[in-house]
Amino acid sequence: MAVLSEIFATKHRGALARSEALDAGGDVPEDVPHLELSDVTTLELEVLGEVAARTLRFGTGDLELEEVDLDHESLFELPPFLCEVLVELGRAEDPEALADVAAEWARSEEMTSTPAVTQPVVADLVELVTKASRDGLSVYLWVEPT
């Protein structure tokens, strides 16, 4: 069974409210930049960060997503280093960098996917994180409670 998840950009209070709406299965406003995904959890995003940082020779930093709040166990914030790496991936001089990262991410032990599936996900994620960075928003991952 696929694990449903959503990555979105907002302020802290908005993230808590969106997480509650997602947890309840209710209507969620469409005015927040977001990506609906399946089978992308905290671990897969950490691996994506490792792959992107290595490909870009960006260095090392904190890639571990942390729970935002004890009352919101399904909500995680992407750490600043991971966001910086993804923004840099969107600005990479090598036009193949994004495709290379997506392909290596697809081949990683943690993913069960193909580059054809991961490349649009990585491109959309880079776009969302870049917009969030420009707008001064944080990026969050919500994972469907199991």
Which residues are covered by each model-predicted region?
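Short terminal or interdomain "cap/linker" segment that borders an active site or interface and mediates
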Residues: 138
